[in-house]
């Protein structure tokens, strides 16, 4: 109870999602219908899908601007909130800064109440960049 009283917006979200869940689906961040497995899983479905939707928007922007700027890159993996890319050394810093900017822009696109932030790392192995 104390947790919820300290986070009134979260408590409101939980109540709203629980109400929607009775119909077997909830609305995602972008308005799409998300079928839920159970009412118990509804809040998790909303939160997990929001992360995926924001990340997809960030990747759309990243691809658009990286092509526009003629950067030499390939996106090789998207794992939850992380993107792994192969980028020519000459473009690595610019691509990294662009990726962070695109994540921030994705949050603005969906009018999130808290700003999104990100970071990038440059390396030759996954271990160095994770």
What are the functions of these language-model segments?
Residues 1-130:
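Conserved catalytic core of nucleotide polymerization and phosphodiester-bond processing enzymes
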């Amino acid at each position: 109870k104390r947790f919820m009283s300290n986070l009134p917006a979260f408590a409101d979200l939980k109540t709203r999602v629980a109400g929607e869940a009775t119909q077997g689906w909830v609305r995602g961040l972008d308005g799409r219908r998300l079928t839920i497995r159970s009412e118990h899983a509804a809040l998790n479905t909303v939160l997990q899908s929001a992360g995926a939707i924001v990340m997809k928007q960030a990747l759309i922007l990243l691809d658009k601007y990286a092509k526009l700027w003629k950067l030499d890159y390939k996106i090789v993996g998207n794992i939850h909130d992380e993107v792994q890319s192969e980028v020519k050394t000459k473009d690595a810093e610019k691509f990294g800064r662009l990726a962070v900017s695109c994540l921030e822009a994705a949050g603005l696109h969906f009018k999130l109440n808290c700003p999104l932030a990100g970071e990038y790392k440059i390396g030759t192995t996954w271990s160095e960049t994770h």
